[in-house]
Amino acid sequence: MTLASIRRGYHVIKTLLQYGLDDVLPPKMTPWYFKLARNSLFWIRNKHKNKPGGERLKLAMQELGPVYIKLGQMLSTRRDLLSDEWASELAMLQDKVPPFDGALARQAIEAELKAPIESLFDDFNEIPLASASISQVHTATLKSNGKDVVLKVLRPNVETKIQADLQLMSQTAKLIEYLLGEGNRLRPAEVIEDYRVTILGELNLKLEALNAVKLRNNFLDSDALYVPYVYEEFCYPRLMVMERIYGISVSDIAALKAQGTNFKLLAERGVELFFTQVFRDNFFHADMHPGNIFISRDHPENPYYIGLDCGIMGTLSEVDKRYLAENFLAFFNRDYHRIAQLYIESGWVSEKTDLQAFEQAIKVVCEPMFNKPLDEISFGHVLLELFRTARHFDIVVQPQLVLLEKTLLYIEGLGRQLYPQLDLWQTAKPFLEQWMADQVGPKAMFKKVSTKLPYWADKLPEFPELIYDNLKLGRKLLSSQQQMLDKYLKYQQQAHKSNYLLITSAVLLICGTLLINRDATLWTPYVCLVSGIILWFVGWRSRPKNRKF
């Protein structure tokens, strides 16, 4: 551990103690030596005693900077780990930091381009359009076509700082698992590992550019979503150049109302976009908070979304997609037995789980929701409660499903903010039913067979030889099995004969011994003894030697 990491660790602990977060630790994590270290090395007074624990954690993470802010945002979606109060507080964390110097941004951009900015762009503005914890955005005009673009560039040394904080987080998580018995259930090390994968993905702007290109191609003919054009020739790990868009932030409800936006259509399109990305494309935007979503200014009666920041994208396996769709449909039909079966069949919960107990737990959670009108039932919270219930049955955490849950909560919250009467169930159910029909119906079967036809056409000439080889192998197996059976029968015969002789010899020996002690004819006991010895010798020698068949 370097001096810098020790210094950073001290600063993190000091900040957490300033907000009195040691007060919320369970007794298992505060033994006498912890209290001794707390009072001797960290004589910091808790200045926020009157504030709730969730608010104190939010303020501490805000002060600790970008890595902790993003961790807090991720944890806000893990209500299976945190209470609702704490999760709601963390959801309010904003990834807003002061911009870094425009001259440094210019230097970083030119290092990636290996050319002066003015040779490729006009009107480069050193004052950033937006600034976040990992990167900031500058505007310019492309020399080649005169179109407005934005240049997204990583902050200087951001990778080093993030790696150092991640290492510290990982060590802390392992310590928590060691000190706290419940740590194994909460799996803090696993949570930090999921976070590490997510945030390191955001540090590669070339990867983000490729994600944006793929998402754009998926919705080229869509009336619901527009993804700005990416200039791939100017994209590098630390730099991304894309078309500049002019929209209204989805959180600016007043501006959307002023232009006469059709909120009902906009909300329904948001739901359809989510399910299309997940079930049709298997490639969904997993960071759809209001800062990344804008609404078109043209045609407010027929509005569409503009999606930015494709650094975090999610995918599901075909198995996960099918089980998820069936899960939702089973919930629509209040089929709790099927929901429990699906969790076990999918491998999300151990196959050793008590199915009836799990079904009952799901029913206890879900049944009260049906006392509300359908348009008041939260789709995201249904999924959340199901995973929280499954947690008590040792659910295996699926990172891709955590991303899905987070995205669904964002989309649903956004849809109801735009149009409070949004009936998400009515919008989603036909889509899911149609998708399931497409997956298991005759057309789907024909499609799956047709995709395999080239493979089988290539293998068809080999069939006669394969059939002949299998028949030949079958004959060999039959012959081998017959030989084994013959050997086994021979062994059994020898064993029976040997056992018969040994038992007879034992009887003769016992009789001879008993007769010697009685007034029997002189020669009778000795004949029995000699005969018994001879039979024992013959029986012993006739035992089968080889037990391998």
From Swiss-Prot:
GO cellular component terms attached to this protein's record: plasma membrane
A Pfam family of this chain: ABC1
Classification via InterPro entries: ABC1_dom, Kinase-like_dom_sf, UbiB, UbiB_bact, UbiB_kinase
Transmembrane segments: 496-516, 520-540
UniProt GO MF annotations: ATP binding; protein kinase activity
EC number: 2.7.-.-
Enzyme class: transferase
Keywords: ATP-binding, Cell inner membrane, Cell membrane, Kinase, Membrane, Nucleotide-binding, Transferase, Transmembrane, Transmembrane helix, Ubiquinone biosynthesis
GO biological process, one term: ubiquinone biosynthetic process
Role noted for this protein: Is probably a protein kinase regulator of UbiI activity which is involved in aerobic coenzyme Q (ubiquinone) biosynthesis.
Positions with a binding annotation for ATP: 129-137, 152
Protein topology in the membrane: Multi-pass membrane protein
Protein's cellular compartments: Cell inner membrane
Active site annotation, chain numbering: 287 (proton acceptor)
Protein name: Probable protein kinase UbiB
The family this protein is said to belong to: Belongs to the ABC1 family. UbiB subfamily.
Record flagged with keyword Transmembrane: yes
Species the sequence originates in: Shewanella baltica (strain OS155 / ATCC BAA-1091)
SUPFAM superfamilies, alphabetized: Protein kinase-like (PK-like) (SSF56112)
Domain spans labelled Protein kinase: 123-501
